[in-house]
Amino acid sequence: MIRDRLAEAIQLRETGRAKQDQAVLEEARTLLLELAAAYPDDAEITFQTAVAHDNLGLSREAVPFYLRALTQGLAGPDLERALMGLGSTYRGLGEYRQAEETLRRGVREFPHNRAIQVFLAMTLYNLQDYEEAMELVLTNLMETTSDEKLQYFKRGISYYALHLDETWG
């Protein structure tokens, strides 16, 4: 029963997100809030409630749900998505140090998640750590691009991603 209602709420939220339908997103959020009240110790419900708030642009309201889900033992893909969501939310709220801490944890625990790395790069930019921000962006670009012109210069770009301030004299 509980998992069926949770699946229904997630499906509603995903439909609302895909269609950018605020009414459907609000319906999903309402259902998730009911589930969160009935099952306050369920990490997955708590996490999905955070996402529903984020999808509606209710970022400040999403943060406590993300934090609670993380302390409730969230794991696997949900943990990965929660770290990404919370880090991105903190960044959007201008809470750059919390964003950096959260996203660095995400990079440590999920090193192959390039989205987390790019959100970390944006956060580092906001913190005026331009060198590390550019290194992350350029490294991710060069490791994922199929653009033949970029591939032609891959060696040089990859080198300079780590040596941005170096000149030839």
Predicted regions and their residues:
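TPR/TPR-like (Sel1-like) alpha-helical repeat modules
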Residues: 71, 125-148, 158, 162
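Short coil turns that delineate tetratricopeptide repeat
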Residues: 40, 74-77, 111, 145
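TPR repeat positional signature
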Residues: 5-8, 12, 46, 83, ...
